[in-house]
Amino acid sequence: TADIANNVLDSIDAIIIPGGSGKSQYLNLGTLNQQRIKDFIAKGKGAVGICAGAYLFSNTPDYTCIQLNGQQAIDIEHDNRGHGLAKFTLCEEGKKIFPKLADRDTSFVIYYEGPVFINNPADTIQSNTLAIMESDVHEEGNAPANMTNGKPFFVANNYGKGRVFSSIAHPEGT
């Protein structure tokens, strides 16, 4: 966060917000750095949110987030639902972005208690679902069944002149 406060965003094209704790990331950034990130993207730069980073990018009522991706996390009371290899399938737009995976029926990525997204109907940001979660993860924390499957796995959207990519899982760890 000190780097952001010291204008590191002026020297990069994209920022990656990794996994961890979306709430901690939100609090550590503080209001000024949150706005700096939003302004950075709006001016034409990019942002990638992975797991907790995707939580941070969401527009989830009563949750610490910076409203960048048009998604709402649901069932956050069971965010410790479990982890492992998760199945996903690419949508048509996702096949264009990930051409090396386009011919696969199903792909796998490490999932570790990431958000369960739905489009936030109150948000003006229009996001594109690039992939759909096919796994039903609910082995821990009394998480209900049939909550994760069929939900957005990768989403992308414009934000001002920039682009935002959100992943509920950990492609960097796969």
Q: What residue spans do the PLM features occupy?
A:
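Alpha-helical scaffolding within the catalytic cores
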Residues: 2-5, 32, 149-153
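A glycine-rich, often tryptophan-bearing local segment used as a flexible ligand/cofactor-contacting loop or short
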Residues: 23-102
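Structural motif
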Residues: 14-19, 49, 164-168
